[in-house]
Amino acid sequence: MESTILKWVNIAQEDLHCFENPQQTFEIVKGMIPYLHIEEIDDKAVVAYAIYPDFRGRKALSEVFMYAKPEYRSGLIFRDIVRRMETAAEKNACKIINISSNIGYKDDRILRLLSLMGYKTDTVSKEL
């Protein structure tokens, strides 16, 4: 799993320059391994998510990282990523799915697609 994490952190960093310190990001993510699930989609894309109980006693699936290589970015690959998370959530009796990483979500097309799939796209966050 560690080699998969490192591979995709490096690919995303090369494309998007999205991590202040990729090695530090890798070390943080390694600490999440007991809860982390990673699914690669034919070396085109990846999604990483954690499954854990929330404070209300319900299981939640929270997306930690998703990335698609530029040549494969489309609504179809994104829909596949989301469906994979939904399938995992159902198999693990999760009651909620949170999609919260901020790479690419400023794209209105992605937000519209999420909305069509039943997701709320209005979140409250503050970057510090």
Where are these regions (language model features)?
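Short amphipathic alpha-helix that is part of the acyltransferase structural core
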Residues: 1-23
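Glycine-rich phosphate/pyrophosphate-binding loop shared by adenosine-nucleotide-utilizing enzymes
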Residues: 42-47, 61
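Conserved beta-strand-loop-alpha-helix junction that forms the acyl-donor binding cleft
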Residues: 97-109
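A conserved beta-turn-beta hairpin within the catalytic core of GNAT-like acetyltransferases
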Residues: 53-63, 120-121
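A conserved beta-strand-loop-helix scaffold within acyl/acetyltransferase catalytic domains
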Residues: 15-37, 46-57
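A short, internal acetyl-CoA/4′-phosphopantetheine-binding micro-motif in the GNAT/acyltransferase core
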Residues: 64-75
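Conserved catalytic-core motifs of GNAT/GCN5-like acyltransferases
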Residues: 100, 120-128
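Conserved acyl-CoA
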Residues: 77-96
